[in-house]
From Swiss-Prot:
Function noted in UniProt: Involved in degradation of plant cell wall polysaccharides. Has endo-xylanase activity towards substrates such as oat spelt xylan (OSX), acetylated xylo-oligosaccharides and acetylated xylan, producing primarily xylobiose; cannot hydrolyze xylobiose to xylose. Also has feruloyl esterase activity, releasing ferulic acid from methylferulate, and from the more natural substrates wheat bran, corn fiber, and XOS(FA,Ac), a corn fiber-derived substrate enriched in O-acetyl and ferulic acid esters. Exhibits negligible acetyl esterase activity on sugar acetates.
Protein name: Endo-1,4-beta-xylanase/feruloyl esterase
Residues the record marks as active site: E161 (proton donor), E280 (nucleophile), S629 (nucleophile)
Enzyme Commission number(s) of this protein: 3.2.1.8, 3.1.1.73
Feruloyl esterase: annotated segments: 370-726
Keywords noted in UniProt: Carbohydrate metabolism, Glycosidase, Hydrolase, Multifunctional enzyme, Polysaccharide degradation, Signal, Xylan degradation
Domain GH10, chain residue ranges per copy: 27-369
pH effect summary: Optimum pH is 6.0 for xylanase activity.
Complex formation: Monomer or homodimer.
GO MF entries: endo-1,4-beta-xylanase activity; feruloyl esterase activity
Reaction catalyzed: Endohydrolysis of (1->4)-beta-D-xylosidic linkages in xylans; feruloyl-polysaccharide + H2O = ferulate + polysaccharide
């Protein structure tokens, strides 16, 4: 059992962090967002009373953020509910927390139609006051708040949401149809017109001569609202109103906005201000709004995986645009600390910390960006993937390793390709006006073969443009990224080729027919000096989720053998590739895996069948066993238990051998271990050194630029084969 666990741990170590056999990942490990973005902009968060009093929550705030906004405590209706009545308790607590921890604040907000101190509009008898009285009260409010907190505040949302939403271009006033006003028809506007905006900024500048004064609003990416905001701010600034910047509320969702609309808004506002803040960022899972949000509240439910991918991708796209415009974007503020705090409801899963204040993968994606990739564009030399269906142009690959996809699904809301970078679960495609979804991987893929599938609105489908390949216990789409050294597995017209035959045999131990594919070298069966030549045999195993087709097709084992034989690098031998019973194994029961079931099939049923029906040299010194990944685990377990059966052993991303595990050093002539350089290269090198020091003939390969994937294993087979049966 100890040997088994060692093998399993080595394979687990070759996988990415998020895939290591279900191990939890601490996505908060590493620098805080404020540190990751120190050369770009400040990163902030809106807080409530719990966020600044609970030690676990305050630790998150202090590590991740260098800007804080009071979610509600500073809003006029909260802090100044009645004339002469001030609720400074929570407001002071938040300000003092920031003072004590050296965190600057955004002051939100001084004047807003909602959560406002509505008493300012009426006298003690409830009758409307004149605008002069309103202005006097508003000035007193602004001066009191600003003077109390300006030592810790660097920017103020002076006026919030004063512009009308997109809607009808006309409205009825006094029974007449007139062009709709660009302004929200608030009590402020009805009393004062747009002058209240100018007055609020004038009062704020009086109180804080150096603070950054912002106009803040939502739906800034909508063309109509964007232009209304632009025109208002431009008009005000031309009149001398001290508006320093625009706050773009980021209440977005996983489908909207796209980069083009967001960038248009940023560029448009940059024409009139040199400071933009993304003030209220969250990404709702659905498109609910208003009263519909009640359906996202209550007990937390898991976020569907594909929606998580969409959300992570949207966060990555947004922050890429934010970084691009760091010259004008000075702050990005998340609206709340966790899903539990969010006004959108916990089941919208809108923030990088979940309802238990645990970091999500989206935090890691936002933080661990690659600045070099921000402006990188693929070379436009795309050609059809060599594994495409006849006549199909997509998917395409280019010389750098990028992949490009095209899917027709006009009624779909989302299409995801399960290939891509950044740990985001794939490449999210975008739909054009014709209902065609297209997209390109964020960066170059590792060269070689990759499985993938499409997720369309949560359903899993294969790409109709390419052939299907068995992996992950199902038929998947496949794509081949060109490799610099691909000639060793390329089809060559100038040489003779062997063939691959399918063999079926009855397995008494499993009670069913089993299948194997057998590679026979060119010339097999020919009579030489009056008798047929016999051949050594390599038993070559696939990994978890695969089957007997994997090595012949994805692994290109036959072509690798043909090319080695033609170049005189090896003498011909047979390769048997059988289903290894791996796919009944369930993650979570790893300690129970012994490979004993396949050992019975292999030793008692398959080998006798092969020796009976093919021209084999039927002894251990002419028999080898090797396997990739879980097939490597099987290889290690079986060769150590049954050393009398195999004289050559090979593990391909399937763990390592150590001298102390092998009871009889004379039991094996040659040991091979290999993996990709993104897996466990240290383990491979250590194993080879130890085996050689103990007197074993051992060889290793660390595949350059690859991970747990077929180019690694093709390279391993090519190298290992040259040392077998010698």
């Amino acid at each position: 059992m100890k040997k088994l666990l060692v093998a399993l741990s080595l394979i687990a170590g070759s996988l990415t962090a998020s895939a290591q056999w279900g191990r939890p990942v601490d996505y908060a490990a590493g620098p805080g967002l404020k540190d990751a973005y120190k050369d770009y902009f400040t990163v902030g968060v809106a807080v409530n009373k719990f966020n600044i009093s609970d030690p676990a929550q305050t630790a998150i705030v202090k590590k991740q953020f260098n800007s804080v906004t009071a979610e509600n405590a500073w809003k006029p209706g909260e802090i100044h509910p009645k004339e002469g009545v001030w609720n400074f308790g929570l407001a002071d607590s938040i300000a003092n927390f920031c003072r004590e921890n050296g965190i600057k604040m955004r002051g939100h907000c001084l004047c807003w139609h909602s959560q406002f101190a509505d008493w300012m509009f009426t006298d003690k008898k409830g009758k409307p006051v004149k605008k002069e009285v309103f202005y006097q009260r508003l000035r007193e409010h602004i001066h009191t708040v600003v003077n109390r907190y300006k030592d810790v505040v660097y920017a103020w949302d002076v006026v919030n949401e004063a512009m009308a939403d997109d809607g009808r271009p006309f409205e009825f006033v006094d029974g007449k149809m007139v062009p709709a006003s660009p302004y929200r028809q608030s009590r402020h506007f009805k009393l004062c017109g747009d002058e209240f905006i100018a007055k609020a900024f004038e009062f704020a500048r009086e109180a804080d001569p150096t603070g950054v004064l912002m106009y803040n609003d939502y739906s800034c990416v909508d063309e109509g609202k964007r232009e209304r905001i632009y025109n208002m701010v431009k008009k005000m600034k031309e009149a001398g109103v001290p508006i320093d910047g625009i706050g773009m509320q980021g209440h977005y969702n996983i489908y909207f906005p796209d980069e083009e609309k967001l960038e248009k808004a940023i560029n448009r506002f940059s024409e009139i201000v040199n400071t933009i803040h993304i003030t209220e960022l969250d990404l709702r899972t659905n498109t609910e709004s208003g009263g519909q949000l009640m359906f996202s509240r209550g007990e937390a439910k898991p976020q569907p995986g594909y929606m998580q991918t969409l959300q992570e991708d949207q966060y990555a796209r947004l922050f890429k645009i934010f970084r691009k415009h760091k010259d004008v974007i000075k702050n990005v503020t998340f609206w709340n600390l966790s899903d539990k705090d969010s006004w959108l409801g916990v089941n919208n899963h809108p923030l990088p910390f979940d309802e238990n204040f645990k970091a999500k993968r989206s935090l890691q994606i936002i933080r661990d960006f690659d600045a070099a990739m921000d402006n990188r564009k693929p070379k436009e030399d795309f050609v059809p993937n060599p594994m495409n269906q006849p006549g199909q142009e997509y998917p395409m690959v280019n010389s750098e390793g990028y992949a490009r996809f095209r899917v027709e699904a006009p009624d779909a809301k989302s299409v995801i390709v399960s290939l891509g970078l950044g740990g985001r679960g794939g490449t999210v495609l975008r739909k054009d006006k014709n209902g065609v979804w297209t997209g390109t991987t964020e960066g170059p893929m590792d060269p070689g073969f990759h499985y993938y599938h499409l997720t369309i609105d949560g359903g899993v489908f294969n790409d109709p443009g390419t052939h299907n390949y068995f992996g992950s216990c199902r038929w998947e789409s496949g794509i081949e990224i060109p490799a610099k050294d691909q000639d060793f597995y390329a089809y060559r017209k100038d040489i003779n080729h062997g063939n691959i035959q399918q063999v079926t045999f009855w397995s008494e131990s499993t009670g069913k027919m089993q299948t194997a594919n057998v590679y026979l070298p060119y010339g097999y069966g020919k009579v030489v000096k009056g008798k047929q030549e016999r051949y050594p045999v390599l038993y070559l195993q696939h990994g978890w989720g695969e089957n007997e087709t994997s090595w012949p097709v994805q692994g290109k084992a036959g072509l690798i053998m043909d090319n080695l034989i033609a170049d005189g690098k090896i003498k011909p031998f047979i390769v048997v590739m059988a289903y290894g019973l791996t796919n009944d194994f369930k993650f979570g029961s790893i300690g129970k895996f012994t490979a004993e079931e396949f050992e019975k099939v292999l030793i008692d049923e398959l080998i006798p069948t092969i020796d009976k029906n093919f021209l084999t040299k039927a002894d251990k010194w002419n028999r080898a066993m090797a396997g990739l990944s879980m097939g490597g685990m099987e290889t290690k377990l079986i060769t150590l238990r049954r050393p009398e059966m195999f004289g050559y052993w090979g593990l391909l991303s399937g763990g390592t051998y150590m001298p102390e595990e092998i009871k009889d050093p004379k039991a094996v002539k040659y040991i091979f271990v290999g993996c990709g350089d993104k897996e466990n290269p240290e383990g491979i090198n250590k194993s080879v050194e130890a085996l050689k020091a103990a007197g074993f003939k051992a060889e290793g390969l660390v595949s350059e630029g690859t991970a747990h994937e077929f180019l690694t294993w093709r390279r391993c087979l090519e190298k290992m084969a040259q040392s077998l049966f010698k």
